Amino acid sequence: LLTILLCSSLLCQAQKERIILGDEQTSEYFPILKGKRIAIFSNHTGMVGDKHLLDVLLENKFNVVAIFSPEHGFRGDADAGEHVSNSVDKKTGVPILSLYDGKDKKPSEASMRKFDILVIDIQDVGLRFYTYYITMCRLMDACAEYNRKVLLLDRPNPNGHYVDGPILDMKYKSGVGWLPIPIVHGMTLGELALMVNGERWLPASRVC
């Protein structure tokens, strides 16, 4: 089951709109997380104001049991393409689970059994060869397979609604191109996740 908290705008006193990110809407998603074993998919971009989402959840006594980190690692200090194995976040002590310890470049069943709900909070840039959306899709597939819920805290696409480039020919599907979308696709991760479900693009036509 996929739940998405979309971004919204707030008209401030200065008559300027400020984007309210999905992760700032704590009154909406804290009740969803209550009593759950939580895993997060995030990195150094997952900031709620001046604090990381992980710190916000732990400060509010939520049971965060695992972290899935994307390319470059949870703290953003790994090299491009570097394999990130199981480890522990030095700051919080929360285990970091490998995304690739199972078959088909997905988390293993043992990793998936550790949590009830996956929270996604990561900044994407709307490019087909950017790997974060590919990791999201693989996690959505694993969550669909093991009946785990997904909560996606959405963020704006910095390239707006700009769309450009050819759609990927799926015979060239790879680790830097996973969906039949343009090079610049013009969607947020939340919008893309909805499209993945709607078009049944996950393996075996699974729906998260």
Question: What are the residue ranges of the model-derived segments?
Answer:
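Glycine/threonine-rich flexible loop motifs
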Residues: 124-136
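Conserved anion/nucleotide-ligand pocket segment
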Residues: 173-208
